[in-house]
Design a protein with these regions (language model features):
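N-terminal nicking endonuclease/strand-transfer module with a His-rich metal-binding environment
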Residues: 1-179
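A short, hydrophobic C-terminal helix/tail in secreted or cell-surface proteins
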Residues: 180-184
């Protein structure tokens, strides 16, 4: 199961790339990949592409996070899925840096990509449709790799605290579910 979220990078591209490439989080940079640029100079290369853009937009790049359920995926498998996701959603038209972080209890990918295509110099349009395409693609790739997928609406109506308690098995609802299954 992977959860995805995305946000724009408006002014701190180099800092964001430096953060995701941190060797302490990426197994000594073994879990760092890039496309169309070098991770070490990606901010400069993104800027060069942006200078040639027809429609620059206001964003320097986009930051996508893909987080996996604890214990469900190896760092290498997560990185492979992240690379497949990046290539599919960006269609080989945008420079990107992909890293896999292993510093938390869950493995997660960070993908920073240029807001301008090096192929046609057009601006990436982020909206609900593009986000849902990212999520659908991520879910499909997770299924193809034998991972679980979040069922839409599964957690609808639960507060954050109830969701966390369910995850930890400490909520009254999870206790009731457990007792019901034990009696069957």
């Amino acid at each position: 199961m992977a959860v995805t979220k995305t946000h724009p990078i408006k002014s701190t591209l180099k800092a964001a790339i430096d953060y995701i490439c941190n060797p302490e989080k990426t197994d000594g940079k073994l879990l760092v990949s890039s496309y169309g640029c070098a991770a070490e100079t990606a901010d400069i290369e993104f800027s060069w592409t942006r200078r040639h853009a027809i429609d620059k937009g206001t964003n320097l790049g986009r930051h996508l996070i893909q987080a996996f359920q604890p214990g469900e995926v190896t760092p290498e498998q997560a990185h492979e899925i992240g690379m497949e996701l990046a290539k599919e959603i960006l269609g080989g038209k945008y420079e990107f840096v992909l890293t896999t972080h292993i510093d938390k209890d869950h493995v997660h990918n960070h993908l920073i990509f240029n807001a301008v295509s090096f192929a046609d110099h057009k601006h990436y349009h982020s909206n609900k449709r593009s986000y849902h395409d990212i999520r659908r693609t991520s879910d499909r790739l997770c299924k193809e790799h034998g991972l679980s997928v979040i069922i839409p609406g599964q957690d609808k109506g639960k507060s954050y605290i109830e969701h966390q308690a369910m995850q930890n098995g400490t909520s009254s609802v999870s206790y009731t579910h457990l007792r019901a299954h034990e009696t069957l």
